[in-house]
From Swiss-Prot:
Signal peptide limits: 1-39
Organism listed in the record: Acidianus ambivalens
Protein name: Tetrathionate hydrolase
Gene: tth1
A GO-annotated cellular component: cell surface
Glycosylation sites: 50
Protein's job: Catalyzes the hydrolysis of tetrathionate to generate elemental sulfur, thiosulfate and sulfate.
Record-listed E.C. numbers: 3.12.1.-
Length: 535
């Protein structure tokens, strides 16, 4: 009888071990490694999903002791890049510490296999600065190592990505700056703003590189065969503990952030794919193919038609004239609703409409975007334009100024507040206010101490943030505070490093910033501009 029990226990043990192996799931209790890593972290490792193996071991480390026990009052949804359709990244909070303002700096890159460079380091000391020059080194570190875009606040956590290879996503306690969980070993650089939907956080990955065969296609005028990045992927993680829920590989990179509406996750790729999936399960709902169209950094947005049908909207680069399109697809079936190019008389150039994520005014039914045009002798116009969100017809286009072509991300992400569009011109280092109904420039302000092309990358690229009656703008090494009524600069505050395509994210009296040098920074607004409370 005892022998039968022993045999039964042995067989049961084999079954349990087999199940754990099948799920590729491991739980490990690690040693104490300091303040950021308390005793007892839980480690999940994944080598495949649904029978398809990963290129890297995906390791998720969860530190439950670092999570906050209180309800911060954050939303459970962050559906698009920069929090909402208008790109105003302001989050309500009930947390007294955030309302009063917290102050911390986290060298995030150090925890995911990179090197967080001190924020006071001059650009000439960056990797490859001697070989590429200061401008090239700043762009390289943003594209290949640090955090290009801003952070996400949802479900009581702050989420940030790193595009150092392999890519990573990290969940951080926004009050203390301690890591709650991190997933390292993604199938490519994570270069965008994570989106969140009711307990699930999503990140898409992919690099900036082209294979040599793409240049052959270009030389042979085979533009429809060109795609960027051999492969990418989309991941869904449990927002609380980081467990992998599902993933799928993509044809071409998946650099831009996806968008979510009513349980549908829509993403685009460098292989000309526009894809809709079930946000909970990852199952395919529809797939569109646009041969030769390349998704760069223009994250997906959406507009809801009066009948309730969502349109997912994204920008694509094309390597021949007109160099870019904005495409809207029906979110229920994937059918193309409309496509648009830059309105005449402007002619798109270079990366075209694939860089800048469009903003959407749901109430007015307007899509706003920004791009370079009329390239000649190294100079371009920086054009902001508006389209009818229902049919894509042009409403207006305005030139915010001509200057040297900026490197890499060639535009300024627009913000819509009321009847005004605020966006940047990285070529000239200006912020512009534009009437959304007419396209009239209301004011234009040059940002002081911001180094611009042709010697430097310039800015601002990320959208401004409107809060407490003020505009908060990040560019170069500074955060600028601007009066939105007349464009007057009230103050500017040194952060250091490089504030690239990112936007300030605000909760209470606290601003959260990502930095290309590999840092996440929390700082009280009252430290940046004490008088803000009077606005």
């Amino acid at each position: 009888m005892n022998l039968k029990i022993l045999v039964g226990l042995f067989i049961l043990g084999i079954i349990i071990l087999s199940a754990m192996t099948f799920l590729n799931f491991t739980t490990i209790v690690a040693q104490d490694k300091g303040d950021q890593q308390p005793k007892g972290p839980i480690v999940y490792t994944y080598t495949e999903y649904n029978g398809t193996y990963f290129p890297h071991i995906l390791t998720v480390v969860y530190y439950p002791c670092n999570a906050t026990c209180s309800n911060l009052g954050f939303p459970s949804v962050w559906p698009v890049s920069n929090e909402n359709q208008c790109h105003n990244a302001v989050v309500n909070t009930t947390c007294q510490a955030l309302i009063e303002g917290v102050d911390w700096q986290l060298p995030l890159l150090n925890y995911v296999g990179g090197v967080a460079i001190p924020l006071s380091t001059p650009p000439c000391k960056l990797p490859w600065a001697q070989q590429l020059g200061v401008k090239g080194a700043l762009v390289y570190y943003t594209q290949m190592v640090g955090e290009p875009l801003g952070v996400t606040l949802a479900c009581g956590l702050l989420y940030a990505t790193e595009d150092s290879m392999p890519g990573s996503i990290t969940a951080i306690n926004p009050v203390t700056g301690k890591i709650v969980w991190m997933a390292n070993g993604l199938a490519g650089p994570a270069m965008n703003n994570p989106v969140v939907w009711h307990g699930i956080v999503y990140v898409s990955v992919g690099g900036v590189c082209f294979t040599f065969s793409q240049f052959v296609h270009f030389e042979d005028h085979q533009y429809c065969k060109i795609h960027r990045g051999r492969c990418g992927a989309v991941y869904a993680f449990n927002a609380t503990n980081g467990q992998l829920l599902w993933m799928r590989f993509t044809y071409g990179e998946a650099m831009p952030a996806p968008a979510i509406y009513d349980g549908i996750l829509a993403y685009v790729t460098g292989g000309g794919c526009f894809v809709g999936v079930n946000a909970t399960t990852g199952q395919t709902l529809w797939v569109d193919h646009f041969p030769g169209f390349i998704a760069n950094m223009a994250s997906v947005n959406y507009y809801v038609l009066p009948n309730g049908t969502p349109l997912f909207i994204a920008g694509f680069t094309y390597t021949a004239p007109p160099y870019g399109y904005i495409i809207a697809v029906n979110g229920l079936n994937g059918h193309e609703a409309w496509n648009a190019t830059m309105p005449a008389p402007y002619v798109g150039a270079n990366t075209g409409l694939g860089d800048v994520a469009p903003a959407v005014d749901q109430q007015l039914g307007i899509v706003v975007d920004n791009d370079i045009a009329n390239f000649s002798n190294g100079y371009v116009d920086m054009v902001t334009f508006a389209l009818n969100a229902t049919n894509g017809k042009p409403l207006w286009a305005v030139n915010t100024g001509r200057g040297p072509i900026p490197p890499a991300y060639k535009g300024g992400m627009p913000l819509i507040v009321g009847n005004v569009v605020y966006d940047g011109n990285p070529s000239l280092g200006t912020v512009n206010a534009i009437c959304i109904k007419t396209g009239k420039i209301l004011w234009s302000t040059k940002l002081p101490c911001l180094q611009t092309p042709p010697k430097f990358p310039g800015g601002p690229r990320g959208s401004p943030t409107y809060y407490h009656g003020l505009l908060w703008v990040s560019a170069g090494q500074y955060v600028y505070v601007i009066n939105p009524k007349n464009g007057d600069i009230l103050t500017f505050y040194w952060i250091g490093g490089r504030l690239g395509i990112m936007n300030p994210v605000i909760a209470g009296n606290t601003m959260f910033l990502s930095n290309s040098y590999g840092w996440i920074v929390a700082i009280p607004l009252s430290q940046i501009y004490p008088a803000y409370i009077y606005y």
